[in-house]
Amino acid sequence: MAKNVGILAMDIYFPPTCVQQEALEAHDGASKGKYTIGLGQDCLAFCTELEDVISMSFNAVTSLFEKYKIDPNQIGRLEVGSETVIDKSKSIKTFLMQLFEKCGNTDVEGVDSTNACYGGTAALLNCVNWVESNSWDGRYGLVICTDSAVYAEGPARPTGGAAAIAMLIGPDAPIVFESKLRASHMAHVYDFYKPNLASEYPVVDGKLSQTCYLMALDSCYKHLCNKFEKIEGKEFSINDADYIVFHSPYNKLVQKSFARLLYNDFLRNASSIDEAAKEKFTPYSSLTLDESYQSRDLEKVSQQIAKPFYDAKVQPTTLIPKEVGNMYTASLYAAFASLIHKKHNDLAGKRVVMFSYGSGSTATMFSLRLNDNKPPFSISNIASVMDVGGKLKARHEYAPEKFVETMKLMEHRYGAKDFVTTKEGIIDLLAPGTYYLKEVDSLYRRFYGKKGEDGSVANGH
């Protein structure tokens, strides 16, 4: 049986094109701070016509393979999590198989998992479970979380974003799953869904979605605490997690969610709540569950109490989600990548609790233990390979007008056929070695190219 199964290596790709939220506020005629303070977002990455979830996946996977010297023949399972529908039948995984076919490896299990922002977690758990099972053949698992989050013009548009993350799964990992510490909450709700197959845009009930997120958080945390207490014979509170990483549609929800965990600890009379905090929480002790979700006063008090804990346990996870935006399935893992980027020298022996949410709704809370392994599969090497700071600095800022123009073109192109992408002015923004969409033919078949290391445009997949 494989031991210490978890994440061996990670890499992230996000588009080099972005728009500043402050500029978007002014362009949209929104009140100053609506996006930057109200949502807690700084910047938003987006795909131009040259990029999509498939090209981003190619970039994340090939970069991970090159930097860790992984032979595609070493992969036995490939799982993709995404809610960005390119095709209602053909999976994103099958496009990626081109990287494996040329090496003669077609014996690769797994397909795509889809449920809003949760598919990446389903894909990850599938790979981890496979390595831990009797079915494991000794090869690595590979997980891709890839999404382009776009919204119609209006209040939801600033909560967009785009990215792909690749994770290599195997035994003796620096990031180990505490498999017994996992709790889920599944329910039927219409908080965010995409019933119009002719459009990329969702139908969203923002207020309901926030409540559903918090309900799922409460439920998962309660079950995780119960499981921990059965296994360890002692209580679990936020003090038992060194860091807590949240699915991040926008940063303000992350702040509210962490504060909610402290309120849960108060209701459970956990040791994380001191006397001063108890006094502040007491007026809200008799609220019904529904009342607690609607109480603005409780929300405010909770966040005040949570602030020092938040700064220590959550703030280091927020860089990429604030700078890139909502990456749907990749959001949780981009937040985790932010933690590795910020704290890679201090993570050995630490416990990280992860909370994944997908509308509809699906949610899982799970626990990771981080070890001080030797390179190439080490925490510090993951930070070095991802080069988050370098990638953020290399981006090109678009004016809001150009962003809106790009969104209109992408809206027009969604589900379209028989077109060749315009390279002029955009291809220069892509780094050498980057995969991009070349054309979609009259049969809707998608063809990708790869920018040469010398900047030339080469044929690809």
UniProtKB/Swiss-Prot annotation:
Disruption phenotype: Defect in pollen adhesion to the stigma resulting in male sterility under normal growth conditions.
Pfam (any one): HMG_CoA_synt_C
Record PROSITE patterns: HMG_COA_SYNTHASE
Binding positions ((3S)-3-hydroxy-3-methylglutaryl-CoA): C117, T159, S209, H247, K256, N326, S359
Record keyword Translocase present: no
Catalytic activity: acetoacetyl-CoA + acetyl-CoA + H2O = (3S)-3-hydroxy-3-methylglutaryl-CoA + CoA + H(+)
Keywords associated with the record: Lipid biosynthesis, Lipid metabolism, Steroid biosynthesis, Steroid metabolism, Sterol biosynthesis, Sterol metabolism, Transferase
GO CC terms, sorted: plasmodesma
S-S bonds: none
EC numbers, comma separated: 2.3.3.10
Molecular function per GO: hydroxymethylglutaryl-CoA synthase activity
Taxonomic path: Eukaryota, Viridiplantae, Streptophyta, Embryophyta, Tracheophyta
Residue ranges that the Swiss-Prot or TrEMBL entry lists as coiled coil: none
Gene: HMGS
Name assigned to this protein: Hydroxymethylglutaryl-CoA synthase
Chain's role: This enzyme condenses acetyl-CoA with acetoacetyl-CoA to form HMG-CoA, which is the substrate for HMG-CoA reductase. Devoided of acetoacetyl-CoA thiolase (AACT) activity. Required for the development of both tapetosomes and elaioplasts in tapetal cells and for pollen viability during pollen tube elongation.
The protein's annotated pathway: Metabolic intermediate biosynthesis; (R)-mevalonate biosynthesis; (R)-mevalonate from acetyl-CoA: step 2/3
InterPro entries referenced in this protein's UniProt entry, alphabetically: HMG_CoA_synt_AS, HMG_CoA_synt_C_dom, HMG_CoA_synth_N, HMG_CoA_synthase_euk, Thiolase-like
Taxonomic superkingdom: Eukaryota
Tissue spec. comment: Highly expressed in flower buds, pollen grains and anthers in the tapetal cells, at an intermediate levels in roots and weakly in leaves.
UniProt-annotated catalytic positions: E83 (proton donor/acceptor), C117 (acyl-thioester intermediate), H247 (proton donor/acceptor)
Family assignment from sequence similarity: Belongs to the thiolase-like superfamily. HMG-CoA synthase family.
Gene Ontology biological process terms in this record: farnesyl diphosphate biosynthetic process, mevalonate pathway; isopentenyl diphosphate biosynthetic process, mevalonate pathway; sterol biosynthetic process
